[in-house]
From Swiss-Prot:
Transmembrane segments: none annotated. GO terms for molecular function: microtubule binding; polyubiquitin modification-dependent protein binding. One of its GO terms (biological process) is positive regulation of DNA repair. It comes from Rattus norvegicus (Rat). This is BRCA1-A complex subunit Abraxas 1. A motif (pSXXF motif) lies at residues 402-405. It comes from the Eukaryota. Keywords: Chromatin regulator, Coiled coil, DNA damage, DNA repair, Nucleus, Phosphoprotein. Signal peptide: none annotated. One of its GO terms (cellular component) is BRCA1-A complex. Residues 208-262 form a coiled coil.
Amino acid sequence: MEGESTLGVLSGFVLGALTFQHLNTDSDTEGLLLGEMKGEAKNSITDSQMDSVKVVYTIDIQKYIPCYRLFSFYNSLGEVNEHALKKILSNVKKTVVGWYKFRRHSDQIMTFREQLLHRNLQTHLSSPELVFLLLTPSITTESCCTHCLEHGLYKPQSGLFHKVPLVVTNLGMSDQLGYKTESVSCTSTVFSRAVRTYSSQFFNEDGSLKEVRKINEMYAAIQEELKTICQKVEQSEREVEKLLMDVNRLKEVRKKQQAQAKGAGEKSQNHPQENILLCQALRTFFPESRVLHSCVISLKNRHISHSGCNTDHHLDVVDKLTLMVEYVYSPEASPAPAAPLSKRKALDTQDQWPAKRPRLLESESRPGPAFRGSHQDKASSSSLDIDTEVGSPEDDTDYPRSPTF
């Protein structure tokens, strides 16, 4: 099985020189790293007689070239200034293995500009194995007597920058003689002082938060309230869903009723209903008039057809026909004065009413050919009623009125 790994080696003398130079300046510093890269293949044989080959690339940082001001060989966009870089490197271009930068009171994270500059340096120097050394010193005490230096070696792999193990040696390459390094977070003295001042109000002596029990109780109460509200919301949603179903069902019923009413209206317009009461009345009172029997009238006074109706509707003339109202005279309900009645009788005598009465009786008693039978008796009885209501001129107390149609 074959694998690859990268290891950075930095001597204590070079690291001390870099730190001394940085602490004697008032701003951040940067520069180029010189050295060499070695590749070593290690073959290990396991108990299963299988060979495992591992290639280890060792980047040995031996020297450095400091730049006494920022942006000395690049601009603010991370683009490399070829003329300035060539002037700085002169004859040591082939021994460049990377570049470094000191940042005060900062975290161990590469900025976007540093990433762009690193890729441009790889392209310009034709060295894909170029590394970047980032050193971030910070002050850990208020008296500024203790300093902390964190360092890291970065190399791009698969488009991302990963930390490479860095060994700081003292007198040689032996691991037992190397400096022991420990990564610490960069903390501000002002932040530490503020936390130390107010920590007693929020933390116990063992570092645990105060009022944790009350916070947990409040959290449990909020959860219970939330469960109750969720149940109410679920119930209301079900009620709303039920109401929506009822509304949709009523809408469907309404649509069906409207469709039925529309169909009935169209049917009534196409086949209007005949006014059978009018037809029966015309046959009863005008049996010989063919002009009145020659058309059929609807309930809306419209002509249905111009052919006569020959159907017997079997309606009782007195009880069913609404066009005839039987008149009943009541002397107690409406008494009439004697003088007007006598005057009316005199006028009737002068107008020869008795001479006209036999002619009226003769026309009323003459039955038509279509209504001989059952209607003959009704017509004769009707004429007798009219005759009775008309009466004689000698009757002074009972004067009839004309029949109402």
